């Protein structure tokens, strides 16, 4: 008799919530259905948007007979890496001028986080540092915990961030938790458009955060998934990163070009490394090369070529910033419109937090039972946390969504 399958005892894993939500939405035959769960930009017709500048550059690449499908270097396309790091740090960055910056092309922002986490687990402040505490915001993007756990970190903690009562930043709690963190802890920071809350510190608050991190010798690991996409302004969205450079920090910054280029399925990311001197950057990159080699070996070229071609050409760069502003402005408009409708309906509670927040997501303050009502009764799909993708709102569904939220809040406590 043949033995049972070697896979017979494998337990069924829970589906990834945000992707299951989209699958449920697709299968729902109700014509009123609205998807506010997906983490991607949508037009006012609820369609994905291929940026006009991306179409133009793709055509240019297709017509370039000098290009081929040879392997890229392990660390990626050199022009892409330098352009990406420059976008985050700014043309006049002292770190760039002093040649103490390195970049690693990665598979999206998640890949950049993972390469950085793997490196830190092996080499941060010595060797084998899996017991170093890693701090993530409460709440945070769920993959932050998963990536650092998978890299072997055993002590993942949260710092206070969201004040549910005020529906804003718990700055004092944030600062207190940093103050009490063991020296040399790693702190994951959202560079802009915090996911899922949409609440960002002001420049003055960032200064306070940096001050505490400096005297506690804490290591910043920025996650920059929305530069330009948050406010429509590339410089404003990179303010915190550039301030930390000016304060002399060494840090990592995971960059994603999924949102601001609309290149979701091309997996275009970059890990920017800022050190104290050029020599240490070369040493760090040499070890990261080893990690990449056993992880994905070589990155794909197409998305990196699109981004590098755009960022290195002044005309295309200007067109791209216009495309990004189009997306950011539509989201800002949808925020204002949703708030206005809820206030006109006299929906219980305050709704100014919707316009105080920034970026693609809004933490509505809806509780899990209210969310359940919206999903089951109104066919409006959103995460149990109450997070919505604001770009899922359109001029056609705004009234329906607002009245449905009003019903949920009024009927269900």
From Swiss-Prot:
It comes from the Eukaryota. The modification Phosphoserine is found at residue 149. Its cofactor is pyridoxal 5'-phosphate. The modification N6-(pyridoxal phosphate)lysine is found at residue 259. Keywords: Amino-acid biosynthesis, Aminotransferase, Cytoplasm, Phosphoprotein, Pyridoxal phosphate, Transferase. Pfam families: Aminotran_1_2 (PF00155). Its main location: cytoplasm. It is found in: Cytoplasm. Coiled coil: none annotated. Its EC number is 2.6.1.1, 2.6.1.3. GO terms for molecular function: carboxylic acid binding; L-aspartate:2-oxoglutarate aminotransferase activity; L-cysteine transaminase activity; phosphatidylserine decarboxylase activity; pyridoxal phosphate binding. L-aspartate binds at residues 39, 141, 195, 387. It is an enzyme of class 2 (transferase). It catalyses: L-aspartate + 2-oxoglutarate = oxaloacetate + L-glutamate; L-cysteine + 2-oxoglutarate = 2-oxo-3-sulfanylpropanoate + L-glutamate; (2S)-2-aminobutanoate + 2-oxoglutarate = 2-oxobutanoate + L-glutamate; 3-sulfino-L-alanine + 2-oxoglutarate = 3-sulfinopyruvate + L-glutamate. Homodimer. Biosynthesis of L-glutamate from L-aspartate or L-cysteine. Important regulator of levels of glutamate, the major excitatory neurotransmitter of the vertebrate central nervous system. Acts as a scavenger of glutamate in brain neuroprotection. The aspartate aminotransferase activity is involved in hepatic glucose synthesis during development and in adipocyte glyceroneogenesis. Using L-cysteine as substrate, regulates levels of mercaptopyruvate, an important source of hydrogen sulfide. Mercaptopyruvate is converted into H(2)S via the action of 3-mercaptopyruvate sulfurtransferase (3MST). In eukaryotes there are cytoplasmic, mitochondrial and chloroplastic isozymes. Aspartate aminotransferase activity found to be increased in cerebral spinal fluid (CSF) of patients with Alzheimer disease. Fetal serum levels of the enzyme in the umbilical artery and vein are found to be significantly higher than maternal serum levels. This is Aspartate aminotransferase, cytoplasmic. It comes from Homo sapiens (Human). The lineage of its organism: Eukaryota, Metazoa, Chordata, Craniata, Vertebrata.
């Amino acid at each position: 008799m043949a033995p049972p399958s070697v896979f017979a005892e494998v337990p069924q894993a829970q589906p990834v919530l945000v992707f299951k939500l989209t699958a449920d939405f697709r299968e729902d035959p109700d014509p009123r259905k609205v998807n506010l769960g997906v983490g991607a930009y949508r037009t006012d017709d609820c369609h994905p948007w291929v940026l006009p500048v991306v179409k133009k550059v793709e055509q240019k690449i297709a017509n370039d007979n000098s290009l081929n499908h040879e392997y890229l270097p392990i660390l990626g396309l050199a022009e892409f890496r330098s352009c990406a790091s420059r976008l985050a740090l700014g043309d006049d960055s002292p770190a760039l001028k002093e040649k103490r910056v390195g970049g690693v092309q990665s598979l999206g922002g998640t890949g950049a986080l993972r390469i950085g986490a793997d490196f830190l687990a092996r080499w941060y402040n010595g060797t084998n540092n899996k017991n170093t505490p890693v701090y993530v915001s409460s709440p945070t993007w769920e993959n932050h915990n998963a990536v650092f756990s998978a890299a072997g970190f055993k002590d993942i903690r949260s710092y206070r961030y969201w004040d549910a009562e005020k529906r804003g930043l718990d700055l004092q709690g944030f600062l207190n938790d940093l103050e009490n963190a063991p020296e040399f802890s790693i702190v994951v920071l959202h560079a802009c458009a915090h996911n899922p809350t949409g609440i960002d510190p002001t420049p003055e608050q960032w200064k306070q955060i940096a001050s505490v991190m400096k005297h506690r010798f804490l290591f910043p690991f920025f996650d920059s998934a929305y530069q330009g996409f948050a406010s429509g302004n590339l410089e404003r969205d990179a303010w915190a990163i550039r301030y930390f450079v000016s304060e002399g920090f060494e840090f990592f910054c995971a960059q994603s070009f999924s949102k601001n280029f609309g290149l979701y399925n091309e997996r275009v990311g970059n890990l920017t490394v800022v050190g104290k001197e050029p020599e240490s950057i070369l040493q760090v990159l040499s070890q990261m090369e080893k990690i990449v080699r056993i992880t994905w070996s070589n990155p794909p070229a197409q998305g990196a070529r699109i981004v590098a071609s755009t960022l290195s050409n002044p005309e295309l760069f200007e067109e791209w910033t216009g495309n990004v502003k189009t997306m950011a402005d539509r989201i800002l408009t949808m925020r204002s419109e949703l708030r206005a409708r809820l206030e006109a309906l006299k929906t219980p509670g305050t709704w100014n937090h919707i316009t105080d927040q920034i970026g693609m997501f809004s933490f509505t303050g809806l509780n899990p039972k209210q969310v359940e009502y919206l999903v089951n009764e109104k066919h409006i799909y959103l995460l149990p946390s109450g997070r919505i993708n604001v770009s899922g709102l359109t001029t056609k569904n705004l009234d329906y969504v607002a009245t449905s939220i009003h019903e949920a809040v009024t009927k269900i406590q």
